[in-house]
Amino acid sequence: MDTSLAEEVQHTAATLQSDSFFFMSPYRSFTTSGCFARFSEPAVGGDDPAGQFQQKLAQAFLNAKTNGIAHPVMVGAIPFDTRKPSSLFIPQRWQTFSRPARQQSARYFSGSQALKVEQRTEIPPQPVFEEMVARAASLTATPQVNKVVLSRLIDIATDKHIDSGALMERLIAQNPASFNFHVPLEDGGVLLGASPELLLRKEGAHFSSLPLAGSARRQPDDVLDREAGNKLLASEKDRHEHDLVTQAMKAILAPRSHHLSMPSSPQLITTPTLWHLATPVEGDARDNENALTLACLLHPTPALSGFPHEAAKELIAELEPFDRELFGGIVGWCDSEGNGEWVVTIRCARLHKNTVRLFAGAGIVPASSPVGEWRETGVKLSTMLNVFGLH
């Protein structure tokens, strides 16, 4: 990798202001400055090209162009529950930068220094989470629900204000192949993360998605690591969980697209800590679709809620002792031409002054083990814990 390129990306992340949006992707990477207008319209109904959300989005783009922003983009985050306000805005300016080579970028970034933790709280505690999983697993064996995704949080209070720009520098170093994001929030906080999961990318008429469901922990030994991946690929439990996601997405996208294609079997992808089952989905959208109509059509996928969605959503509300807010939502951007890219808000943290909230979830099916799901969510949480220098 070119040293000047690595230094450019490092500088971009390290000098990031808390009010800047930053998005790093194989497709388009850019950062913003200034805020022309915030957009808090709930995204419920956002899949309807003629609905209120899309009409207000079009008006926001028109206002930006009228005020001299030639190529406006809408950036930010949409919550898990689309009835809640969105955290979107049109920036005054945005600038693209080259994404560093995936396999070489980390060596150009400085190491991390552990934060001093004043308080750490697991929400819910392990015994309660395992009870939640056991309850959900028993219910997924009934006709009412096939899968539900349950999540947990870690709240951390530190001894000083947390520098989100420095954290982004380390996040990119440790997760160079992820979709890395930094979203400024209206309360002065920041949502940042390293998502492995592409919900929807659209350029022109063509769109793609890469849903993930089913995971296994990476191993330090190369032989054992490959065995872990092969075991995941052969796992009946994980293949079932994954198939629920892909078949639901196929049913949702088919009426709104041309030439929809996906392979019959999943493939393996990796993050620094996990193997995942993944299935690439591609198609051509109908004329009245844009990146956000399709993203809202898919969100939340069964990988984040469960299946069927309404039954899973009710079970999540019953069992989880917190509001997910932006966790399990989507982060990304779209432009006035209908292009855009949205990723699932996982492997992430919400920062505010000296506090951090981390989130991780796991798909529960009849074969799920309560202690196994606690461990799986722990591995997922390690992505962000490592960024903070915590374990």
Go through the PLM ranges and name each one.
Residues 280-391:
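Conserved hydrophobic core element of enzyme catalytic domains
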Residues 49-158, 162-163, 258, 389:
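Non-catalytic accessory segments adjacent to catalytic cores
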Residues 153-154, 185-191, 249-251, 266-273, ...:
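A glycine-rich phosphate-binding loop feature that marks nucleotide/adenosyl-phosphate handling sites
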Residues 23-40, 157-240, 257-260, 338-361:
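An anion-binding catalytic pocket shared by soluble metabolic enzymes
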Residues 32-34, 39-44, 95-127, 133-134, ...:
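Contiguous alpha-helical scaffold segments within structured protein domains
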Residues 1-52, 155-161, 165:
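Short Lys/Arg-enriched alpha/beta "domain-start" segment
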Residues 19, 72-78, 148, 180-184, ...:
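A short glycine-rich, hydrophobically flanked beta-strand micro-motif that places a catalytic Asp/Glu
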Residues 76, 143, 200, 247, ...:
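A residue-level signal for conserved active-site and pocket-lining positions in enzyme catalytic cores
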